Amino acid sequence: MKVIPLASESLGVRSLALFLKIGKVGILIDPGVALGPKRYALPPAQAEMKALSLAREKIQEYAKKAQIVTISHYHYDHHTPFFEGIYESSSVEKAREIYAGKLLLIKHPTENINNSQKKRAHEFLKNAKEIAKDIKFADSQSFDFGSFTIEFSPPVPHGREGSKLGYVLMVLVDDGKKSVLHASDTQLINDKAVEWIIEKNPDILIAGGPPTYLAHRVGNVKEIGMKNINRIISETNAKIVLDHHIIRDKGYERFFSELDERPLTFAEFLGKESAPLEAYRRELHKLEKGEEVEVPGGIKKFLKGLK
C-alpha cells in the first residue's frame, strides 16, 4: 500500500486529504480543502491562496487515479462541494471530476448529523447521485474488495462528546500487509474514537489533533488530547501522523515534544518541513507589506518556492 498525504495545515491549508494506492486501485479519502476566511481578524494571505491553489491541483490530480472516494463528514475541508467557492477553490466542474464514475463511501446524510451538515449532505447527494458509479452510506459498515478491506467506525463526535459540530466517520483500510486508519476530525478528544483506534491497532494512524488554538472557546483540550494520544502510543503499535487543527496553533511543536513519542505532520511524512501558514497569517500579511518578520524555516522554503 502506498500512503500519499495530499493536503493539510502543515502543507499550508485546511485539509486532511489522503490518497492510498493498493495494486491498481486508488482510494481518495476526504477530498476537500479550504482556508479559514478569518484568522486574527485577517483574510487569507496571498501565500495561503497560492497554497490553496496547489492543494486543489493535487487533489484533482489524484482524483483521476481513484476508483473509490470516502467522505467522513460534510465540512468543506473534507469534501469538495458543487459550487464556486473562493476559499474552497471549488466549482461544479472540479466536484464532477472528483466524483464522476466513482464508488462513494460516505457519511449518512440524515442520521447522526447536525442541521448544517444535513443541508450540505442534501446538496452534495443531489448532484453526486447523478454522476457517481455507486453511493453507499458507510456508517459502521465494512467493505471487502478481495485484496483489501475498508471498514468504517460508528459515527463519533467531531471533537468532544456533545459537540455542536456533529459526527464524523473514521476509516480503516487494510491490505493484509499494512493498515491505515484515518481518524478525520475526531481531534482525539473523545473516548469513543480513542477506543475504536486502540481496538483496530493500525500500522499508521492519521488524525487531526486537538484544536488547542481554540482553547478559549472549547476548554482544556490540550491535556485531554495529550492523555489520549499517549494512551494510543502505549496501547498500539501505530506510527502517528498528527495534523489539521493542532497545526493552526503556533505552539504545536511544544505539544508534539511533550508527548511520549513525537508524531509526524503530513509535511514531515513527505520528507518536507512543515509550513503552517494559517498560524502565521499575521506575519505573512506583514511580509507582503515589505516588513521584516521571523517565520519558521518551512514557511521560508514555501515562500521561496513561489518566487
Swiss-Prot record:
InterPro entries named in the record: Metallo-B-lactamas, RibonucZ/Hydroxyglut_hydro, UPF0173_UPF0282_UlaG_hydrolase, UPF0282_hydrls
Similarity remark: Belongs to the UPF0282 family.
NCBIfam families per record: PRK04286.1-6
Protein name per Swiss-Prot or TrEMBL: UPF0282 protein PH1002
